[in-house]
Amino acid sequence: MGTFDDLTKKRNVVVTTYKRDGSAVATPVNVVVLGDHAYFRTWSTAGKAKRLRRDSRVAIAPSTARGKPTGPAIAATARLLRPDEVPVPREALAKKYPILQGKLVPLAHRLRHYDTVHYELSASEPTGPPN
């Protein structure tokens, strides 16, 4: 199985999700690694959230801020966190990215009336994109 150890100190990563037709969509996100899992947040109507509702398989790799991969991808499975599971990763994201994830992203989500959702990524065996 893959591990997220290499992503612990990375500022930017790219999460690749899959459309219905199996084509990959790579999106840069901020993640925080806690133990054997990585966490990120988005809003509930974002394209990646819609794709994750249909297919939880993802690939995650270190990247530039614009999403260009800078290292090997790790196959993973994404799980939407329940509201009672959110405080720990939310606080960890705010600690790692104090301005962006601690202030700006939450403010933008509130101002735009977005429902913020958090995902947990667990490393898995690579299975390839869906058919």
Walk through the language-model features, giving the residues of each:
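Generic intrinsically disordered, low-complexity segments enriched for polar/acidic and small residues
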Residues: M1, V15, D36-H37, A94, ...
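Basic/polar N-terminal segments that are highly enriched at the extreme N-terminus
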Residues: M1-G2, T127-N131
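Residues at structural and domain junctions
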Residues: M1, L7-T8, A38, A75, ...
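A generic short-segment signal for beta-strand/edge and adjacent turn/coil regions
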Residues: M1-G2, L7-K10, T27-V31, T42-A49, ...
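Extreme N-terminal tail/first-helix region
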Residues: M1-V14, K68-T70, K103
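Short helix-to-loop capping/linker segments positioned immediately adjacent to catalytic or ligand/cofactor-binding
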Residues: G2, V15-G22, L104-H109
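Short, structured beta-strand-loop surface elements
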Residues: T45-H118, S122-E125
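Short beta-strand segments
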Residues: K10-S44, L52, V58-P62, G71-I74
